[in-house]
Amino acid sequence: MENILCFLNSYTETGLSPDSHCLDIDLNFICLSGLGLFILYLFYMVLTLYSSPTEKNNDTQKHQGRARRKRKSVTFKDRKSLQKEAEEERKLHSFLKSFGPPVSCSPLGQHHDTTLFRRLLCPDPVCRVCNRATADIQRLLSWESLKDAAPSVSPLASSASGAESSFTLASTPSATTPEDLILSSRPKPSPPPPLILSPDLITTLADLFSPSPLRDPLPPQPVSPLDSKFPIDHSPPQQLPFPLLPPHHIERVEPSLQPEASLSLNTIFSFGSTLCQDISQAVNRTDSCARHHGPPTPSALPPEDCTVTQSKSNLTVLKTFPEMLSLGGSGGSSTSAPTTKGIDHSCPASSEFSWWQPHAKDSFSSNFVPSDFMEELLTLHSSEASLGGHSVANIIQPVNISFLSHDIPALLERQVKRRGDFLMWKENGKKPGSFPTQLRPNYQLNSSRNMLTSTAVKHDLAESFPFWASKGKLEWQHIHQQPPYSKCFEDHLEQKYVQLFWGLPSLHSESLHPTVFVQHGRSSMFVFFNGITNTSMSHESPVLPPPQPLFLPSTQPLPLPQTLPRGQSLHLTQVKSLAQPQSPFPALPPSPLFLIRVCGVCFHRPQNEARSLMPSEINHLEWNVLQKVQESVWGLPSVVQKSQEDFCPPAPNPVLVRKSFKVHVPISIIPGDFPLSSEVRKKLEQHIRKRLIQRRWGLPRRIHESLSLLRPQNKISELSVSESIHGPLNISLVEGQRCNVLKKSASSFPRSFHERSSNMLSMENVGNYQGCSQETAPKNHLLHDPETSSDEDLRSNSERDLGTHMMHLSGNDSGVRLGQKQLENALTVHLSKKFEEINEGRMPGTVHSSWHSVKQTICLPEKSHSQIKHRNLAALVSEDHGVDTSQEMSFLSSNKQKMLEAHIKSFHMKPILNLSI
């Protein structure tokens, strides 16, 4: 180790010495290496300056290549899913476009009517989720229309005339009628530049011609469409009418109106670039009722003839408004209501006004104020006040909801549900479909799950069926029929009430009130969406009174007579007489309506459609009525009563019990009263007998035993007094009578109690030793000096005698039955004595007697055994014969009788001594 350190020191010293050449070599090498590095750095900087554009291009190419590889790495399954989503989107667009003709059209696009779609979502006019979904769908359709119309736009530079044809809506009150639509063209010196349309252009146009609220004194002046010019072709000019007025259901128009320049206001006109060539087909499809029940048909005619022919379709919108609801002003206004006659005043449909509102408010967009809508509804309801004595005309919505394919409703529901779930999640769990509590007077806001049970029974006008029909359409069930209320081209329309619980459950949860007047063929009906008609119908349409509910007397309780005692139950014959009302069907008042209740839902059927009930059904209904009356009388349902009768029958009435014991005839159930089987009847009678026996014997045994410890025994005192009166010569007679009483009472007592008492007494184990100890004992000892004997010996002897008698009498079940108190008094003697001895801290007499009997068994002669056998045989013979005489008890010796007498006297003196102390 030391050698290595010396070598290192010498090497470092030579390297660091100034005379060494190693340091010179290192300095030269360092300078050369630094110069080379500097040159390399300069070369690198020059190269980077020249190669930076190339590297950037390479980087972009690399990124593009990565993107291409990512796109190529998409699996076939992802492509299939993307294609499926695109196909679903196309189907949805086509389905939404097929809902109805556009409200207004322009050469560049169409604004489709989403009102029907909005009504299909939910009937709540202020539902935020549904309004947003409708607005999104409307924007989507607007974009699609703009995309479809973009290729068809041609530049105006190629036009020869150099003038633009624009359409204005104007009116001259002095020259033409208010509803004439004059088509005019204004030449321009130069064509305007092409206009890039915004997606909200169609909505703006709809808002321009929206009807003013009912509370506004003056409607807004319509804006000419010249403010937003459209580059259009100079091919045949097209009309551009807008729904300036709500459509009117007109039977007759004033003859002063010229048909050449008049435009029928029964519908919302739609003119599109793709739907303007079916004029001949539209003419062929018209029928006699097309003017009143037909749908809007897009058609285009030359400018000089503005008469529009309507055709028939599945989706129609027919609305009526009175003259006072016209949107035009009195002077110089471009829109005013036509003079109409024969307006249908049969029924109010105030909620239909909300269906015109989406055209003006962008399908219930977010800027729509619910309070304004409610004020309009209330204003429309008060017809006499706001309309100057004119009743509100019908707002007829004949809708025949039919879908092209079964997949379309599911697709629509799935798309809307996604949007609804997202909006609900965004609103942090707020309930969609929240609505003011009081929409109008006497209106109750109920949930859809409580509608069937509460409101439907209350109004008797409800029937529910699902929103999406199984076969792609709703099967309208005609429920309520009324007499004809109006004439429309001499056709009587039937009014029917239907309650529809429809709408997507994720979009709204409250049941709302909108009313729809739907036409199906030649008949029409009022459809109450998640709501029931109330008393406002009777105020608004006196022609259509609300149907009177008919109630079956199924749950009307019969009051019990108050003169009956509390625990007394009615006899079955009395129950039958109370429970048999007259047949409910003849008692109903004459009415054309026929009511049927099904699970708490009452609905009315026309009399001709209601099937007649079979006799079995009538019997079943009568039996249900009787059963309900029985439940009201007895206070418990029949099922509970049967179960209680089987397991725990009620205590019978004491009055009925006494009567039954006097008559000695069991009460039988009449088979005609209740349909009971023979087994159930037998069980019922058996339980009744058992309860009567228990009621006869009074309180249970344990209660009597506890009461016997608190009060002295009267019967024992009476026996002791009789013994003292008659003297010692009658002891045998008294004892024989007492034993006879014990035997008779024991035979009448239930056997189970005898078994328990015999088991209790057999614990003393004195069966064979009693006779021995008593026969061998000196007879004169107790006769001459009974007071000198100890109380314990007397008690033990009396206990053994009593035990012998009880064991002898336990097997004898025959005999005359007497009262229970005598047996209880005899038995409580033993129990009270035991309790007293235990309480006083003395040794029980049974233990002392057992010791005494053991001592006496040592000196037992053989004669005693023979006497015991003879006595046992006599007891068996007496048990076999079962004769209730005192001679059978003669096997008791005088010694035993004296012991019993002494015991009774001492037991009788104890309570007296205790009281004196």
Swiss-Prot record:
Gene Ontology cellular component list: membrane
Membrane topology, from the record: Single-pass membrane protein
Biased composition, class Polar residues, residue ranges: 164-177
Pfam assignment, any one: FAM75
Chain segments carrying region Disordered: 55-80, 152-195, 773-798
Claim: Oxidoreductase is one of the keywords in the record: no
Ranges of compositional bias, category Basic residues: 63-74
Parts of the chain that traverse the membrane: 29-49
Biased composition annotated in UniProt, kind: Low complexity: 152-163
Assigned keywords, A-Z: Differentiation, Membrane, Spermatogenesis, Transmembrane, Transmembrane helix
Biased composition (Basic and acidic residues): 782-798
Main location: membrane
Similarity comment: Belongs to the SPATA31 family.
The name this protein goes by in its record: Spermatogenesis-associated protein 31D4
Originating organism: Homo sapiens (Human)
Gene name per UniProt: SPATA31D4
